[in-house]
Amino acid sequence: MGNKPTISVSHLGCEKNRIDSEHMLGILAQQGYSIDANEELADYVIVNTCSFIQEAREESVRTLVELAEANKKIIISGCMAQHFQEQLLEELPEAVALVGTGDYQKIAEVIQRVETGERVTEVSQNPTFVADEMTPRYRTTNEAVAYLRVAEGCDYRCAFCIIPHLRGNQRSRSIESIVTEAQQLADQGVQEIILISQITTNYGLDLYGEPKLAELLRALGKVDIPWIRIHYAYPTGLTPKVIDAIRDTPNILPYLDLPLQHSHPAILKAMNRPWQGQVNDNIIERLKQSIPNAILRTTFIVGFPGETEEHFEHLINFVQRHEFDHVGVFTFSPEEETPAYQMPNQVPSEIAQARRNYLMEIQQPIAAKKNQKCVGQTVEVLIEQENPTTQEYIGRSIRFAPEVDGVVYVEGEGQLNSIIPVKITDADVYDLYGKVI
């Protein structure tokens, strides 16, 4: 056991990738490999790459090149390995193995083969694997927070997206499997779990013949975890049944992450999104009526091929009309394997960037107003960090998801990884400030 090499993992990309990294670490730790966060001390560095858009690929390439220059033995896993496969081995002699998105469960076997001198390619052309509660996992988030994947892959074919090509079709886990893992996390002291998949509202469709998110939420309501947050909720899947489950289940937070991407019907149709513009209006109004304290986050893509000033104006009005709590804006990234790459009327990047900046400017006063409404309120805050210099704590209220939203700066006595009452005394565009009650 002591002779096994030391492994480090460089995690890039989204939280779905993070879970893959955590499973690889768990499998290796269980099999007696030493894990070290310091890449300099590792015999092998697994780089779990992202290939969603050009910017993500560039970050992955930079990381790979830096490790290659340091003469590290590199195992490339994740979406770039799935995307480019043998091309990566040709361009990076230091890479000793490729592991696809549906093959990370074989990581220990891959390293054993590499140790015999083999240069390994372990990439399934159509990924089918989905980890469950039996797959070892070594969490890399703070003690109080964990991501919980309810399904892998995607059945939609949006015109700008290569995710189905990289991760395969949707494969849902059973309700029993997810609840069992949630209970395991509760037993580890986790205070918040974040449900993720490519389309969380489509959960169960492939397994049960119909979406089962409402049933899953009610089952998770029986697990002793204070906060359960839903990411990637498609508006068309927010049926009255799902909305009722969110409203009626105390530990399901009234926080919804809605990847709308645009508001104009013509752009949504060109994007091949599974709804049209007017549906967004109706669903968002219904959400606000059914869950008056709903916290809504969304993302938009600007500069999609064919987007005119009129289309963009429609989006501006939509954002102003609905006053989302949190908005992320991305410029369109042309991906070669997608229909959008070949579309006419490509928008110049400088125009797309200007539209992104303008939309973010429109959102800022809305976000500030939403945060300002919290001043004077006492809210529950999950304490995640302590600043040893100022004795100040940093945490999040239910308004804020990890990494993508703001934080709460807290004065007073608190305990890490616990949820405590905090009176909000001040706010800015992104963050809140308060004192322990």
From Swiss-Prot:
Swiss-Prot/TrEMBL GO biological process terms: tRNA modification
GO cellular component term of the entry, any: cytosol
Location in the cell: Cytoplasm
Pfam families assigned: Radical_SAM, TRAM_2, UPF0004
Cofactor(s), by name: [4Fe-4S] cluster
Protein keywords: 4Fe-4S, Cytoplasm, Iron, Iron-sulfur, Metal-binding, S-adenosyl-L-methionine, Transferase
EC number: 2.8.4.4
InterPro entries, A to Z: Elp3/MiaA/NifB-like_rSAM (IPR006638), Methylthiotransferase (IPR005839), Methylthiotransferase_CS (IPR020612), Methylthiotransferase_N (IPR013848), Methylthiotransferase_N_sf (IPR038135), NA-bd_OB-fold (IPR012340), Ribosomal_uS12_MeSTrfase_RimO (IPR005840), rSAM (IPR007197)
Binding note for cofactor: Binds 2 [4Fe-4S] clusters. One cluster is coordinated with 3 cysteines and an exchangeable S-adenosyl-L-methionine.
Domain MTTase N-terminal: 5-116
Binding site for [4Fe-4S] cluster 1: 14, 50, 79
UniProt-recorded Gene Ontology molecular function terms: 4 iron, 4 sulfur cluster binding; aspartic acid methylthiotransferase activity; metal ion binding; protein methylthiotransferase activity
Domain TRAM: 372-437
PANTHER family linked: RIBOSOMAL PROTEIN S12 METHYLTHIOTRANSFERASE RIMO, RIBOSOMAL PROTEIN US12 METHYLTHIOTRANSFERASE RIMO
Name of this chain's protein: Ribosomal protein uS12 methylthiotransferase RimO
Organism: Crocosphaera subtropica (strain ATCC 51142 / BH68)
High-level lineage: Bacteria, Bacillati, Cyanobacteriota, Cyanophyceae, Oscillatoriophycideae
Gene name tied to this protein: rimO
